[in-house]
Amino acid sequence: MSKKGFTLIELLIVVVIIGILAAIAIPKFANTKQKAYITAMKSDLRNLVTAEEAYFADSNAYTATVTNLKFQSTTSVSTPAITTGTGAWYATVSHSQVTTPASCGVGINTTNPVVAGASEGEPVCQ
């Protein structure tokens, strides 16, 4: 009579291999949600830049009021805190699920409120 099937040792080896692969893969995907939240904040700021520039093209001034821009933030991203000056503005946002970085910011014709050396119009998080 011939026996068919796997031995206990073979099954244990397979379980150990799966465990090793899981130990490698899980840390790689652990901060995926965090990256998605940060991307949502940056995307909102890019959309805000477009809305502010469109408003500026129509009225020759920037606005600190989000309702004037007809701008809607992504879910869980705070309403942008916009500060305007003469021909310049900057804004910051935060996300309710993100603790680090605390906020993201963008500036036009002024220093970025989050990272001083950032490129103009480029959202940066810190």
Task: State where each predicted segment sits.
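Conserved short hydrophobic patches within well-ordered secondary structure
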Residues: 16, 38, 90-91
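Periplasmic/extracellular, small/polar-rich flexible segments of pilin-like filament-forming proteins
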Residues: 46, 50-126
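Aliphatic-rich helix starts adjacent to a transmembrane/signal segment
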Residues: 28-45
